[in-house]
Every structure is written in structure tokens, then in C-alpha cells.
Amino acid sequence: MEVKAKQLDSVNATASVKIPSGMIKSEVENLAKKASKSVKMDGFRPGKVPVSAVLKRYERELTQDAEQNLFKSAVNSALQELKKESKELVGEPYFEKFDRKDGEIIAELILSFKPEIKLDGYEKLIPEYQTPKVNKKEIDEKKDELLKRFSTPEAIKTKRALKEGDFAKFDFEGFVDDKAFEGGKAENYVLEIGSKQFIPGFEDGMVGMKIGEEKDIKVTFPKEYGAAHLADKDAVFKVKLHEIQELKIPELDDEMLKKLLPGEEKASVEVLDEKLKEQIKNEKLFKLVNDELKGKFADALIEKYNFDLPKGIVEQETDMQMRAAFNTFSEKEIEELKASKEKYQEKRDSFKEEAQKSVKLTFIIDELAKLRKIEVNDQELIQAIYFEAYRYGMNPKEHLENYKKQGALPAVKMALIEEKLFNDIFMPKTEKSEKASKKEKEDK
């Protein structure tokens, strides 16, 4: 096997590899000999399977394993020549060229190493911003939202028509082609008008009804309706309204304050307002950071700091972005790309600049996290994945296993580190500015 290594820049090197067919064949035979001692095959006793039988049945798999072993050996030889260690590598070696002729393999690999980055003066790049302000109206609206969670529907005493936001207690029976259908009947059913729990048109048809009124409401079941025999069918619902209910919002008395402020010794409206103000401010700041500040800061970091990028990582990121974009291509565009290598390469190259920015930012964030001592432990990683699973109604353990199988845990961890990092950068600044503003008021 011939291996020639060449350093391209501070973080990239090439390894030109030539593997003779005889070496591949020899490695395949060695693997077959080892496998023959443990493989189970009908007609043979354990440990007595002939090598020829193993080769015949598993030649393809053995060849793949043999080539993989030889390339690992080639990479180790290249690292020795470059005076590098395997732990310095980032990502997998990237095949820039791979040719097979008469059993011989000729390949060109890109080996990439982690860049050294100095982020002197990064603090000056943190964008300036105003601490979000919270007014009384916003606090009152948030308070109303909280109180609504403890509210209960109660029958109204005044005579008026049903309107959106009311709760209606009514009987109904549905008919398709003048025939009642299963599951289309109920008595004393309670429905919030405007909640869109029923099929389109039903709740709108009830608006304006009065207590005791009977009405036929005509609707059409959606094409995608769960019960196939009703999908896209016209129907008539005979409805009788018994009661109109309104949400009764509880008063903000001492008992309610204790519910809204559990564990607070001196529960009061003032304490609640202060906590709601802080909550709203943090929500606004979170939105500001994610919608504006994070992007500005990232762009400034990318523009200011220049260093050699690991080519293999950039190529892998480009491939990933290209694959993701395939979902947005039209069938015609996909066919054109499959038919023309030039068009495919041109399209792929269009993602290169964005891939370079993404890789660059990843290394910058990694270095920033180290500077600011930001870490994410295994427990935090698992909790984040479990929380995601619960949000989407998935099995948390299976969700975690899927991430492991896809090799996606490092990406999830990096996303969590990034979130922690930006919170660390922007949130303390808010606290400092708040203290400064309070001091200013005191001085005045």
C-alpha cells in the first residue's frame, strides 16, 4: 500500500492512497479465517465452517470490512507522516477521489484538524440593545390570562343570543342523506363557540341562537375527515340550545393570590405584578435575542475572525445542506440534477458559502463556550431530548435511541451549548442595566 501525505494549510492535509488488489484479497481472507471460527452456518459444526464457505456467502461484507480496515491503516500512516495524532482529527476523512480499477483502489482523502482560534475583543462585538420595557396594560393582560385558567363556565341569567366565546349546552343529531349516522348524536353537550372543535361551519351556524331555539345546521365534512364514510359528505345537524354559559373569572382575592404565588410568604398583588413584569420582560428579551441579537452577533463574529476551515467538515456540511434542500426541489429539477453531473455540482456549490459560515460559526461558538466555561452534561442532554419527546407525544427512550443511532447527539449538545452561551452573554447584561437604571433613579 502506498500512502503520501501533504499538508495543505494549518488544518487540512491530503492523503493519496493506492491499495493493490492483492492486499485487499489478503485482508479479506484474514477476516474470513477469523469469522470461520465463530460464524454459524447450517451443515457445519460451530468453529468448523470452511473459509471457502464463509467467503462464498459473505464476500461482499468481508470486502467492505477489509477496505475499511486498510483505509484506517492508510490514515494512521498519513498521520505519522504529518506528525499528527488521531485525536487531533475532526470529522471523518473525506473522500475527494475514489477509483477502482482491476481490483486496485486509488483514492484521495482530505484529513482535517481542529483549528486554533483566538477571540480577542469579542465582547466589543456584542450588539447594544435596550432592556425591554413592560407596561401596566401588559401586566394586566397577563394577569387576566392567569385568572382565566381558574375560571369556570356558568349559565347566564340575562336573555341574549349565543356569541363567540360563549359555552353552549345543547342536544344535536346529525343526518347524511336523511339518515342518522353513528356517533352523530349527543344530549346536553357543552361546546365553546369559536374553539373549532366541531367541523367547519357548525359553530358559526350556532352563533345567534337563543335558549330553547331549535335549528338545522348544514355542513360538509372535510375531505380528510377521520371517518372515511363521512368524508366530503353533506350533512344536516338538528340542534336544540338549552343553556348559554359564560366564563366566570374569579376575583383576585387572598385565596387566589396564594394559588398564583405558591410558596410566597407575603402573597400580594404587588408581588404578583412584579413577578409577571419579570416574566414578560424575559419573554420579550428571549424573542429579541432569537429574532435579532443572536444573528447580529453571529454575523459580526464571522466577519471579524478568520482562520482556516477544516475542508472535510465543510464538504460534509455542504452535502447535508444539499440533501436537505432536495425536499424543496420540484420533480423536474430533481430529474435535471440526476441527468447532469455539471448541474448537480453547480447546485451543490451554491450551498458552499453558507456551509462555510455554518462551520466557522460552530468552531467560534465552541471556543466562546470554553472561554465562558459553558458546559452541557449528559443529564441536561437527556432531559432536553426527553422534553422534546413529551412535547410531540413520542416515547422518550425511543426518541433518545433514535438520536444515538443517527449519531445526532453531538449536534443536539452543540445546540444546547449555543442556547446556554447566548443566555450567558445577554441575560446578565440585562440584570446589570436594570441595576444601573435603578441606581440612576436613586441618584436623581
Swiss-Prot record:
Its EC number is 5.2.1.8. It comes from the Bacteria. The keyword Chaperone applies. GO terms for molecular function: peptidyl-prolyl cis-trans isomerase activity. It is found in: Cytoplasm. GO terms for biological process: cell division; protein folding; protein transport. The keyword Transcription regulation does not apply. PROSITE patterns: FKBP_PPIASE. It holds the Pfam family Trigger_C. Involved in protein export. Acts as a chaperone by maintaining the newly synthesized protein in an open conformation. Functions as a peptidyl-prolyl cis-trans isomerase. HAMAP family: Trigger_factor_Tig. Consists of 3 domains; the N-terminus binds the ribosome, the middle domain has PPIase activity, while the C-terminus has intrinsic chaperone activity on its own. This is Trigger factor. It comes from Campylobacter jejuni subsp. jejuni serotype O:23/36 (strain 81-176). The gene is tig.
